[in-house]
């Protein structure tokens, strides 16, 4: 049961970080197609997070899924701000999002490879990883 909770927490943190990053950089994006693409990605992260919230109560009756802690969030946003001060092109933004998305894929794969989780938790994790892999392919267009 604990491994299911931990897996759901980690995936939810990744989804929340993805949503936070998109919200943070969306005003810097200049291309309309890229903006639409990020909106679609944001909605996918939101959907996964909502589904995790629904599933979470099955494993923890009193808790809610963990989100990214404030310090991690602030450091990530500060890093984005610093890296886009000189080069705030859509290409640079896509590069930063790609790096973050790859971190999410790696974390998700590690969890799947090393933890024993229930089938429904495994399914949502697979969907999250697949969604991020699709996002990587999409972001490559904007490099």
What is each PLM-predicted segment?
Residues 29-32, 52-55, 59, 115, ...:
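Hydrophobic stripe of amphipathic alpha-helices that form coiled-coil interfaces
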Residues 50, 54-95, 99-103:
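Carboxylate-rich helix-loop segments that flank metal/cofactor sites and access channels
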Residues 1-30, 92-116:
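Alpha-helical bundle segments that constitute or directly flank the non-heme di-iron/ferroxidase center
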